[in-house]
Amino acid sequence: MKTGKRITALLCSVLLLAFLVSCNTLALAEEVPELNWTDLVTEEIEAQGAFQKIEISDSLSIQLWIPAEMISVDTSFMDGPFKPVALYGTEDQARSVILFVSEVSSLDEYVALMEKEGGGSNFNSIIINGVECISYDVEKDNILSLIYPVSDHMVLSVNCMPMDADENWEITRNIILSSIHPAE
C-alpha cells in the first residue's frame, strides 16, 4: 500500500514538474498558464478522492475534487456576509480548502478589493479548465487563493491553507484547483 502511495506521489511530482516547466515556458512567451484536470490527473489519483458538488445559486453549481483525507466541515453555525459555501479539512486541521461566493460588479473591481482590503499580493492570471481565473497570495494568513468567475457578476473564491506547506500538499492543492468545473 505504501509503495502505491509513493508511486502516486512520484507521478504527481513528475506531472507538477512538467506543469511548472510549461508555466515557465509560457511566462517567457507572456501567455497565461493553464491547469486542466485531464492533463494533470490519472485515474489512480482521481480514485484517491471524490468530486463534491457545490451549490452556488438555485440554477448554478460547480464541482471540485476533494482528496479522501479531507472531510466536509459543517458551516451552518457560521453567520455573516463571509459565510463559506463549503469547507473541507484534514482531521488534524493542518490543511483546508474554504470556498466563498461573492457578488461582484466586475472581476477587476473584485481583484482591486482583494488587493486593498483582503491583503492579497502576487496576482496572476491562470486558466482552469478553460476558465480565466486569478490566483493570489494572502501571505499574512498563509493562504493561496483562486478567484473563479462563475457568472458575469459572481465569483467563487477558493482559499487553500496553508500556502507554504510541504510538496505533497502543493501537489494536492494543484490537483484540487485543476478539478474545478461547472456541474452537469
Predicted regions and their residues:
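Solvent-exposed loop/turn segments at secondary-structure junctions
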Residues: 104-106, 140-142, 154-155, 162-167
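Short, surface-exposed coil-to-beta transition loops
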Residues: 37, 82-83, 94, 110, ...
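A short acidic-to-branched-hydrophobic micro-motif
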Residues: 85-109
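Short hydrophobic/aromatic-rich beta-strand segments that constitute the beta-sheet cores
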Residues: 72, 99, 135, 156-159
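Signature of long, low-cysteine stretches enriched in small and polar/charged residues
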Residues: 112-155
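Short acidic-hydrophobic surface loop/beta-edge motif
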Residues: 43, 50-59, 86-90, 124-128, ...
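Glycine-centered tight beta-turn/hairpin loop motif at sheet-sheet or coil-to-beta transitions
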Residues: 57-63, 91-96, 139-142, 153
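N-terminal targeting sequences that direct proteins away from the cytosol to non-cytosolic compartments
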Residues: 2-12, 19-82, 160-184
